[in-house]
Structures are given as structure tokens and as C-alpha cells.
Amino acid sequence: MSSFVTNGYLPVTLEPHELTLDIKTNIRNAVYKTYLHREISGKMAKKIEIREDVELPLGEIVNNSVVINVPCVITYAYYHVGDIVRGTLNIEDESNVTIQCGDLICKLSRDSGTVSFSDSKYCFFRNGNAYDNGSEVTAVLMEAQQGIESSFVFLANIVDS
């Protein structure tokens, strides 16, 4: 995983009932709820600091809500194709084999190996190696996929040890 820090403006939408004396708290909560630990366009905000030293730009009324661009210092994380990651093998059935690596989900394609059921548990076989469901494996990221909520998603292949 790689990361970088940038200054930017994050747009958030506030409802009329949120425009009270607690507006700073409501803005902070809206920024965190909308952007923190959410995968958007291949990157995820891991840390957000709202800049108090910069004036807040005027809001814009859109569909009975107020859109505010909030000045922030944002630390983003992202993954590259070719990165090598380590995680837990999760086999739900023959067609759903993934590796869970914290904020990253690696999907294994059918041609990555074969799944069999033995001794009341699933096993994944690749190049003569057997990997039990729940075992720690290493994988190389092959292709980025559409992320889900708070996780990156990549197609990956297991690296034989």
C-alpha cells in the first residue's frame, strides 16, 4: 500500500436542521461519515484534518440542502497493480474465493486454482500446493475492480511459497 498527503476541499451536504450552533461538529461528522475509510476512485482517505486556519467558502443551496466545500489535509492510501499483499484465505464456495487483507479484498479467479472439499472444509489447490480455508497466504495484485464501501477490491493470484 502506498500513501500521500494533500490539501483539498471535500464537498459535504448538510440538511437544514444541521445548520445550528453545532455547525462545526456537524460539518466534521459529515466529512468523516462521507470520506473517512471509504474507497473513492481508487484511493481511500485514511486520515482527515479539517483546516481551521482557512475560511470556509460560502455554501450552495441544492435541492433544499446546503453543499459546503470543507478545506482539509487528507492522507490517502492506495494500492498498485503488482503490489504483494498478505492476508487470510476465505473460501465460501467453489466460485467465491477471496483473500481478506484489512481494507483490501482480493478476488481469485477460477483459473487461479481449484477448490475442493475434504475433511469437512474447503481447500484451494494451486501448482501442487494446498491452502486451507482461513490460512495466511501471499498474493500479487493483478487488476483493480470496483471497490465496495470501505474496501479496495482487486483480482489477484496467490504467490506460491
Swiss-Prot record:
Reaction equations catalysed: RNA(n) + a ribonucleoside 5'-triphosphate = RNA(n+1) + diphosphate
UniProt KW keywords: DNA-directed RNA polymerase, Early protein, Nucleotidyltransferase, Transcription, Transferase, Virion
Subcellular location per the Swiss-Prot or TrEMBL entry: Virion
EC numbers for this chain: 2.7.7.6
Molecular function terms from GO: DNA binding; DNA-directed RNA polymerase activity
Keyword Nucleotidyltransferase: yes
Alphabetized Pfam families for the sequence: Pox_RNA_pol
Biological-process GO terms, alphabetical: viral transcription
Reported induction: Expressed in the early phase of the viral replicative cycle.
InterPro entries assigned to the protein according to its UniProt record, in alphabetical order: DNA-dir_RNA_pol_18kDa_poxviral
The keyword Disulfide bond belongs to this UniProt entry's keyword annotation: no
GO cellular component labels: DNA-directed RNA polymerase complex; virion component
Top EC group: transferase
Described purpose of this protein according to its UniProt entry: Part of the DNA-dependent RNA polymerase which catalyzes the transcription of viral DNA into RNA using the four ribonucleoside triphosphates as substrates. Responsible for the transcription of early, intermediate and late genes. DNA-dependent RNA polymerase associates with the early transcription factor (ETF), itself composed of OPG118 and OPG133, thereby allowing the early genes transcription. Late transcription, and probably also intermediate transcription, require newly synthesized RNA polymerase.
Subunit text: The DNA-dependent RNA polymerase used for intermediate and late genes expression consists of eight subunits Rpo30/OPG66, Rpo7/OPG90, Rpo22/OPG103, Rpo147/OPG105, Rpo18/OPG119, Rpo19/OPG131, Rpo132/OPG151 and Rpo35/OPG156. The same holoenzyme, with the addition of the transcription-specificity factor OPG109, is used for early gene expression.
Family note: Belongs to the poxviridae DNA-directed RNA polymerase 18 kDa subunit family.
Protein name (record): DNA-directed RNA polymerase 18 kDa subunit
Organism the protein comes from: Vaccinia virus (strain Ankara)
